[in-house]
Amino acid sequence: MRILLLLLLSPGFLLAQTKKAIDRKKSTITYSMNHLLHAWDGTSADLNGAVQLKADGSIEKVAIVSKVSAFDSKSSNRDAHLLEVVEALKFPNISFYSTSITAAKDGTLDVKGVLQFHGVNKETAFKATTKNLNGTTQVTGNFIFLLEDFKIERPSFMLKPVDNEVKVKFDVFY
C-alpha cells in the first residue's frame, strides 16, 4: 500500500502522458533503391507502432515496426530476391524507436533513435514534420541508410550491384 501511495504521489506520475497507436489504415513507409539500369520503390502499409505524447500534446517517444515481407515493390521477383538478401526468415522485422525528439515551434521535429534491421542496431537522426488534420496528426519525413551499415551484401543485376544508399520516406498518422 505504501508503495502504491508513493507511486501515485511521485512527480513522474503527475505528468499526464498519452499513448496513441498509429493509424494502420493510413500510415506507410517507402524505401527507394537504385541500380545503374533502373530505380524502384517498395512500400509497406502494414505498420504497428505507438506514439507517446507529453502533457502539452507534443511527441515524446515513438516506436514503429514493420515486417520486411510487407514491403511491395510491384515486382514479386524483386520482392522475393530482396527477402533472400536481407534474410527475412532470420530477421523478419525492421523497426525504429526514438531516443530523443525535440520539437520546434514551426512543427518540425529533430528525431534521434535506433533503426533495427538485419540484426543490427544503428543510431540515426532525421527531421520530421507534423501537421494537425481535424483531430488526427500526420508526421512525415525521410532519412537515408546504407546497406553496408546493416551488414547486407548488395544484390547485383547484370554484374553491377545496386547502390549502397537506401532512401526511406514515412507518412505516419495517429
Regions found by a protein language model. Give the residues of each.
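Bacterial Sec-dependent N-terminal signal peptides
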Residues: M1-K19
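Low-complexity, acidic/polar, glycine-enriched regions of mature
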Residues: Q17-Y174
